[in-house]
Each structure stands twice: as structure tokens, then as C-alpha cells.
Amino acid sequence: MSEPTVTSTPRPWSQRFEGSLHPAIARFNASIGFDIRLLPYDVAGSLAHVQMLAACGILTQQEADQIRWGLEQIQQEAAAGTFRPDPEAEDVHYAVERRLVALVGEVGKKLHTGRSRNDQVATDLRLYLRDQIDHLRQALWELRGVLLDLAERHLETILPGYTHLQRAQPISLAHHLLAYEEMFWRDWQRLGRVREEVNVCPLGSGALAGTSLPIDRQLTAHLLGFERISANSLDAVSDRDYLVEFHAAASLILVHLSRLSEEVILWASQEFGFVTLTDACATGSSLMPQKKNPDVPELVRGKAGRVFGHLQALLVTLKGLPLAYNKDLQEDKEGLFDTVDTLKACLEAMTLLLREGIQFQPERMAAAVQEDFSNATDVADYLVRKGIPFRTAHDLVGQIVRICLAEGILLRDLPLERWKTFHPAFEADILTAIEPRQVVATRLSAGGTGFAVVREALQRAQARHQQPEPSEETPQT
């Protein structure tokens, strides 16, 4: 099919006006600089729309075939990176339409029958975000897999657990790693729920009131893989709740990534020494030749604030908008695109860091457990098992710790005879009860850090990690 020569058409609304738009205002008004990212989704929506128009008899089959051919050409250009939007096009929708008319002639102007850019952009956004959520869930799945592999390798490794960044109780490293796997498991589930909210088709809602043409919205939704159609046309074109929910879910993921990053940064310091950074995932200093800097987790931690800002910006944009569509909603895209890009990059970087960028130091972790009073709670528990009220036991152990600090010794340095001077309930087994490995092993309550409990928790996490994705759809890009 040859390309007919067609004269350039004005903006889709320009016939209402006598004068021309000031170039500065045209630049200010345009979104083509960033919404061009929606091109494959805009074309996909148009292909479904034209198929529906033909099925409903609004277009002839010949017209639909011509338009479909043109849209497929645009798809190929986009895939090859050769699509160049018309300089006069103010947004991706009109860029597609102008290129279509250039390819197929006047029949291309029939594509926009029965729809508005308002329901069109709402559809594009949902298609885009549904696709990106699938990619992000896959990235979370990979990160969880790395954490599970590390946990399996470190079931027997112990280290201090912290509260208030003070050593608290000995725990297993696997237990610590599985705590993050739990967070990212919740994130994976949460994104799945957001996807359900995204998977609603607004196409056919028109500018705000629907259309008088006999369209079939259910058919369009089916062709685009949507679960259902929107119920109210006013709400459909102005609803951005699903974007807020996505930004909130993304922010939570970055909270978890940032917390993990903070711990890697601390653990890589000489003050902790629990991990060392490999050359593949660290940088140096331009001045201090001895430095090895944890730039990757620092950047993840820093980028979290950027994503939080996009959530707040969207909420502020939406809070004062009357129904239905307002131009303010053009501002929903750049933050969304940046959040998606940033989150993808952070997940990829953290997965790589955990897989190849850090080496745990079990000996240093074990030594740190021996250097403190993190077994003090177990002395109190020992007395409780002897029938002494916990509060009484707690007070007594606090006094023992104070005495040890004054003498510059640890609990493990106390001989049995000294223990007995504190309370007659202490017997020879107190010496083994406060050994770090024994302390960890006895934490057998559900969800605890006991070796046996953690092994069972790991098996459950591995089993759910092997479950198939609830969505079998293949991402478009």
C-alpha cells in the first residue's frame, strides 16, 4: 500500500479559534516530549478501538483494514526506533493520528470516532502501568530469590540483632535476611492488588459523558485484556486513584530497599565489618586512596526520597480538581515515568549488589556477639524457668550487668561460684544457657530466630517463591 500525500492538518481543536497559538504557549502546553513513551500503548488502544468500530458497523471493514495497516506501520516504526512525531503534534495521541493520516489518507481521520483524548490517555496510562507492574513484580521476584539463596547459605551464621542501633539479642543471619524477604513478598502481593485496580478499561467514556454512537465497550476491554469496564464516564476520565496506589506501593518498596541499604552501609563500615564490598559494586575516592565507598546502597537510599516526592506531588495535584478532566492531569505522567524507572533501577542494583557485590563475614559477626551483653535476656529467661517472676528476674539481671560493666567483664566471664552469689537458682547449666549459639537455638516460638524455626520459615518462603505468577500475560515491552 503506497503512502498518499496529505497536507498537514492543524491542531485537533484549532478550527474553533481565529488566531494562532503563541509559540511559547504551544511549547508550554505540549506533552509530546514525555508522553511519547506511551506510543506503543496508544497504538494498541487504537487497534482495539478500530476493530470495535468495525464490529459495530460504525466503520466499514475496508476502512478498518486501511486504518489497521497504518497503525501497524506506526508500530513497526516505533519498534525500529524510526518513528518521528510531527513537530506540530502537541501530544502522543495527535502524533499517532497525524502519522496515520500521512500513511492512509483521509480515512485515518475516522480513527478518533467515538472517543476523546480524555478516555484515550486514561486507557494508555492503564495499559502502560499494567505492563510496568508485571516487570516490577518480576524484579521483586528475582530479588526475593537472591535473599532466599543467601538465607539458605547462612542458616547457621549468627550475629547481633539490634534495637535502637544497640546490640540486643543474638539472631541468625538467615532470620535477618528472611525479614527482608517478607517485606518484598508483601510488596509483590501489594503490586498485584494495584494491578487489579489498574486493569479497568475507561475507553468509550468519551470526554466525560460517553458517546451517542453504538459502540461496544466490553469488546474493546476484551481486546485489550482488561478485566472489566469502568462504571461511570465522569469518574473514568478523571480517576487517578490507581496512580496514587501505585506511587504508594512503589514508595513502600523504596522504604524497604532504603532500610536494607542503610544496613549494608553500616555493616560495610569498619565499625561493624559484617560485610565487605566487592570491587564490582563499590567506588573509590578521588582524594583518599584507601577508600572503598558503598555508592550503590547510598544511591538507593537517596532515590527513595525522590520517589516519595512524586507521590506527594500527585496527591497535591489531584486534591482540588473538579470533575471531570482538567489539564492539571497532564502532570501525572513525568512523575509516574520517573518512579517506574527509578524503582526498576533500584531493584536491579540491589539484586546485583546482594548477588555479587557483598561478602558476609561470619567470623566478625560471631565475634561481635561475644563482645556484649546480648545474652542478658536469656539469663532472665533462665530464672523464669526456675519459677522466679520475670520482673524480679529482669531487675536482678540488670544489677548483674551493671556489676560486670563496673568490673570490665562479660557474663561469660563469671564463674559458677559468682553466679550463685547473685541467686541460689543459678546452677552449672547457666554457663551453657548463655552461649550465643544456644541462645539462638532456643528461640523456638513461631516466627522466632531458632535455627529449626528459621529452617521451616525458609522452606515456606521457598515454596511460595516457586508458585506461578497469577497473571500469565506477557508484557508488551
UniProtKB/Swiss-Prot annotation:
Q: Which InterPro entries match?
A: Arg_succ_lyase_C, Argininosuccinate_lyase, Fumarase/histidase_N, Fumarate_lyase_CS, Fumarate_lyase_fam, Fumarate_lyase_N, L-Aspartase-like
Instruction: Give the E.C. number(s).
Output: 4.3.2.1
Q: Keywords in alphabetical order, please.
A: Amino-acid biosynthesis, Arginine biosynthesis, Cytoplasm, Lyase
The record ties this protein, via Gene3D superfamilies, to: Fumarase/aspartase (C-terminal domain) (1.10.40.30), Fumarase/aspartase (Central domain) (1.20.200.10), Fumarase/aspartase (N-terminal domain) (1.10.275.10)
Biological or metabolic pathway of the protein: Amino-acid biosynthesis; L-arginine biosynthesis; L-arginine from L-ornithine and carbamoyl phosphate: step 3/3
Tell me the domain of life.
Bacteria
Sorted alphabetically, which HAMAP family does this protein's record hold? Arg_succ_lyase (MF_00006)
**Per the similarity annotation, which family is this?**
Belongs to the lyase 1 family. Argininosuccinate lyase subfamily.
Q: What is this protein called?
A: Argininosuccinate lyase
Question: From what organism does this protein derive?
Answer: Synechococcus sp. (strain JA-2-3B'a(2-13))
